[in-house]
Amino acid sequence: MQEQKFRILTINPGSTSTKIGVFENERAIVEKTIRHEGRCFGNIKR
C-alpha cells in the first residue's frame, strides 16, 4: 500500500520576521526567513 503524501505550507508572521516553510508530510522541503522592521505592521489592527 502506498503512503499518502501531504504538502503543507506554513506561515509564521512575527514582529521582526516572517518564517515560511513547505513540508512534505514531516520533512521540510523549503524553509525561509524574511526579516522586516517591526514598524512595517504597526498600523494593523487586531
From Swiss-Prot:
InterPro entries: Aliphatic_acid_kinase_CS, ATPase_NBD. Signal peptide: none annotated. It is an enzyme of class 2 (transferase). Its main location: cytoplasm. The keyword Nucleotide-binding applies. Keywords: ATP-binding, Cytoplasm, Kinase, Nucleotide-binding, Transferase. It is found in: Cytoplasm. Its EC number is 2.7.2.7. One of its GO terms (molecular function) is ATP binding. Belongs to the acetokinase family. This is Probable butyrate kinase.
